A protein has these predicted regions:
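Mature, solvent-exposed C-terminal subdomains and processed small-chain segments of exported/organellar
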Residues: 1-57, 62-156
């Protein structure tokens, strides 16, 4: 599913956090619901934001193709339940903290920092020559997401 624009850094960071909370964190609700229904041997998500039209996907490895409707139904049902009843506050906070830590640490393993920063610059510069540093200026976004999460979670 296409999600917004690659130039919307806040939306992209927020969807990375959601992908973590829904599919990667321990006890992630969408992943757990699919595994409990025996849809595939493993479930994972992916949010690809280095392109103009970022996309979000959910993959069930070794799933039966005939269970496609069940797969979609479980995802929709789980997401509707989350919208109705709220989401685990700690999972959202953990996702924000995880991505903020990775951003601050800038540990790219064996890859040179300059190369990785260059790739980050191209994520926005390719589509808007006036915003080459958009993906390098994320600290304020993490602060804003923390406030939004606290506000939204306090309502549930």
């Amino acid at each position: 599913m296409v999600i917004g624009s690659g130039l919307d850094v806040k939306l992209n960071v927020a969807f990375s956090v959601l992908e973590y909370a829904l599919l990667d964190a321990p006890g992630a609700p969408v992943k757990q619901a699919l595994l409990d229904a025996h849809i595939g041997k493993d479930v994972y998500g992916s949010y690809e934001d280095g392109i103009l039209q970022p996309f979000f996907s959910i993959v069930a490895k070794n799933a039966d193709e005939n269970e496609k409707e069940k797969f979609l139904s479980i995802i929709r049902g789980t997401l509707k339940d989350i919208v109705k009843n709220g989401m685990d506050r700690k999972a959202i906070e953990a996702g924000i903290n995880y991505f903020e830590f990775r951003f601050r640490e800038a540990d790219f393993s064996s890859f040179p920092k300059g190369l990785m920063y260059g790739i980050d610059v191209f994520d926005s510069w390719l589509y808007d020559e006036n915003k080459p540093f958009a993906y390098l200026q994320q600290l304020a976004i993490y602060d804003e997401l923390k406030k939004l999460a606290k506000k939204a979670i306090s309502k549930t």
